[in-house]
Amino acid sequence: MNRFTAYAALFFMFSLCSTAKEAGFLHPAFNFRGTSTMSASSGDYSAAPTPLYKSWALPSSLNLTTQPPPPLTDRSYYELVQALTSKMRLDCQTVGDMTWRHLSEMLFASWNSVKEVSLKAASVTLWAIINIWFGLYWTLARLITLFLWTFSIEALCLILLGCITSLIYKGALSLSEHLPVFLFMSPLKIIWRAAFSKRNYKNERAVEGYKGFSVPQKPPKSAVIELQHENGSHLGYANCIRLYSGENALVTAEHCLEGAFATSLKTGNRIPMSTFFPIFKSARNDISILVGPPNWEGLLSVKGAHFITADKIGKGPASFYTLEKGEWMCHSATIDGAHHQFVSVLCNTGPGYSGTGFWSSKNLLGVLKGFPLEEECNYNVMSVIPSIPGITSPNYVFESTAVKGRVFSDEAVKELEREASEAVKKLARFKSLTDKNWADDYDSDEDYGLEREAATNAPAEKTAQTNSAEKTAPSTSAEKTALTNKPLNGQAAPSAKTNGNSDIPDAATSAPPMDKMVEQIITAMVGRINLSEIEEKIVSRVSQKALQKPKQKKRGRRGGKNKQNSLPPTSTQSTSGAPKKEAAPQASGSAGTSRATTTPAPEAKPSGGKNSAKFTPSWRIKQQDSAGQKPDLKLNSKA
């Protein structure tokens, strides 16, 4: 039965398709709009879709007549099925739209409800958490307050014990972290130092085959001083130089600083080297430049000497000074060449010579380091002074020709300058953990404290005389010319020229203070000076010199004795031949401009005879006095 029904349905559909094809399936009359006004409930079947007619198929306006719609029975099955399908599709679309609209409204209302409920639930939950948390803290605070109020001493003890326990725990943790590394690395460091840190230099020895000589002679400007141990035994030497910053400094070998005392043979004073502040220190180059405490030059009775930096050292003869049986001896030496960052020197040295300076005339070249341990090296080495702008060299560039016969190349000089600059910057950035450097502890030294107290309590008269001499005498700084570098082996280094004003500024005005302690000491010392007493003494000395009668100088070419007689107002005419030249007071002289070089002027005459007079005397008629005689004109006799 089911199979028969299926076959009947297929036959019915095939018949419909055949009928539609025969009736003109693609005819324009069967192109429906897809809309209908038929209502299923009214039973009006005449409301079939209106076919679309093309413009050529429309009847003319004259033949239009109202015709009733054909009955449905005249339609084909295809048209009926098509109309039914369109109706069903439209009804389904309408029902679907209404269903979707109702579902959307329901979903939107449900979403709003769920959202409101969720927000309320979250708010209630958060406030519950806040209340519980705050309640816990409030309860805990009340309990702690009650506990501290009731058991104050016990609570304090517990807090201290807790802090101590925490510190012990942190210390144990840190120790457990670093102790294995320390135990592992310490033997490696010891092995490394023993294997690769062998010394390449020894401090002193005599050069084989070099025959030197020694003569008794004092160092230039007493610039070489002895370094001693704390017990007074000999240690080495140090040299005083004048820096371009205007300060005086000590230069010595770096290995001579530990436990050393700077000792003066003139004054007998001793100053520990720990009170000196290093402005340059290099263990690799074995040289140190140190600035001392206030008035250390006066305590040691030394003056700053000139020096030559590494970029200007040339080959040639040199000398160095040592102390033998309480007397200074000058020994010969020869600058031979370069040895790595040092200078090779041919000289005979012995134990205790370290730190002594090598001199070319009055210029310091460097300090003695020792001698290299290589087999082929038969000479000593000298540590040179690096060129540090503003400290050991000026900040400007010399406009001169290139230096001839230099020992170091440009690359070696630049390397020395770079190392010196890094060392100075490292010392400037150094700050102790206790905010107090080792150079600030010179007040705690008993020997130096007694020496400084004795120097401070010196007679005020000596200070007044020194100040008055500086006030009355003309400034000699303008009369001094810049010292040039002395020739070495016939080859001279370039010299800095001055224009009358010293290029080296005064230490009190240009040199920056070492630290606040030194500045306070200087301020206290200046505050102790009695300026009123000094001014009175200066005025008294100047007035005494102004009231003194100038002495008449003898003429070397005229002969005879010049007598200065006081004449009455009606004196006779003068027969001296020239008006008297009054001598200016000593304090009225002015400093003249200094020459730009130390070489003799081309117009200067050789020594051996006196220069002629700087003026030519001329005769003038003396005015007639009220009761005097008329002058007789006479000509001077030519000498």
Curated annotation (Swiss-Prot):
Residues 207-399 form the Peptidase S39 domain. GO terms for cellular component: membrane. The keyword Signal applies. The active site is at H255 (for protease activity), D286 (for protease activity), S354 (for protease activity). The chain crosses the membrane at residues 121-141, 144-164, 172-192. The record marks E204, R205, E399, S400 as: Cleavage. Residues 455-515, 539-639 are annotated as: Disordered. Its EC number is 3.4.21.-. Specific enzymatic cleavages in vivo yield mature proteins. The protease probably cleaves itself and releases the VPg protein. The VPg protein is probably further cleaved in its C-terminus. GO terms for molecular function: RNA binding; serine-type endopeptidase activity; serine-type exopeptidase activity. Residues 548-561 have a biased composition (Basic residues). It comes from the Viruses. Residues 587-602 have a biased composition (Low complexity). Keywords: Hydrolase, Membrane, Protease, RNA-binding, Serine protease, Signal, Transmembrane, Transmembrane helix. Residues 1-20 form the signal peptide. One of its GO terms (biological process) is proteolysis. The keyword Membrane applies. It holds the Pfam family Peptidase_S39. The C-terminus part of protein P1 and VPg/P1-C25 displays RNA-binding properties. Belongs to the peptidase S39B family. This is Protein P1.
